[in-house]
């Protein structure tokens, strides 16, 4: 049981790290000396030095991506907190439904954010020299891991 709890906590922390990195790092779209993320656009030289960064445009779709990524982090943190609370207060044989629901919501939020970004980002559709960066890919990797973690929480029963 201890090994199972430890592996679930490691999976949950891995999801949290993926969510934080994908939200913070400026690598959602890269190409031609530019790097774009949810918060700013940066241009770099061939040596890798950052020359100029400016805030991303205030598009409604970008604000919805920002909001859903932040919500996914909040839901995942709440889920981890609720897991520890339920671990000590839940009766024997009880299931971690609330924890699982919050983690599944975190997964759905990150999936929504990545899907909206995929469909709506204008530079990607206009220029084939751009490609998705690693932070964008980490967001997509966090989606199935968060769903898996949430399903494990829902199935998990508390033992002594």
Curated annotation (Swiss-Prot):
Residues 32-64, 120-133 are extracellular. Changing residue 72 to L: In DSS and CMT1A. InterPro entries: PMP-22/EMP/MP20-like (IPR050579), PMP22 (IPR003936), PMP22/EMP/MP20/Claudin (IPR004031), PMP22_EMP_MP20 (IPR004032). GO terms for cellular component: bicellular tight junction; compact myelin; plasma membrane; synapse. This is Peripheral myelin protein 22. It is linked to Charcot-Marie-Tooth disease, demyelinating, type 1A: A dominant demyelinating form of Charcot-Marie-Tooth disease, a disorder of the peripheral nervous system, characterized by progressive weakness and atrophy, initially of the peroneal muscles and later of the distal muscles of the arms. Charcot-Marie-Tooth disease is classified in two main groups on the basis of electrophysiologic properties and histopathology: primary peripheral demyelinating neuropathies (designated CMT1 when they are dominantly inherited) and primary peripheral axonal neuropathies (CMT2). Belongs to the PMP-22/EMP/MP20 family. The chain crosses the membrane at residues 2-31, 65-91, 96-119, 134-156. Its main location: membrane. GO terms for biological process: apoptotic process; bleb assembly; cell differentiation; chemical synaptic transmission; myelin assembly; negative regulation of cell population proliferation; negative regulation of neuron projection development; peripheral nervous system development. Ubiquitinated by the DCX(DCAF13) E3 ubiquitin ligase complex, leading to its degradation.
């Amino acid at each position: 049981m201890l090994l199972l709890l430890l592996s679930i906590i490691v999976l949950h922390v891995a999801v949290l790290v993926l969510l934080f990195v994908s939200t913070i790092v400026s690598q959602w779209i890269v190409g031609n000396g530019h790097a774009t993320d949810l918060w700013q656009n940066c241009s770099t030289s061939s040596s890798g030095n950052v020359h100029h960064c400016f805030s991303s445009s205030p598009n409604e779709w970008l604000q919805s991506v920002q909001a859903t990524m932040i919500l996914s982090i909040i839901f995942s943190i709440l889920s981890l907190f609720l897991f520890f609370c339920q671990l000590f207060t839940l009766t024997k044989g009880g299931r971690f439904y609330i924890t699982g629901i919050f983690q599944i919501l975190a997964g759905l939020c990150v999936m929504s954010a990545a899907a909206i970004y995929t469909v709506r980002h204008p530079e990607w559709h206009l220029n084939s020299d751009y490609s998705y960066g690693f932070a964008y890919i980490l967001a997509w990797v966090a989606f199935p891991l968060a769903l898996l973690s949430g399903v494990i929480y829902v199935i998990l029963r508390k033992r002594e």
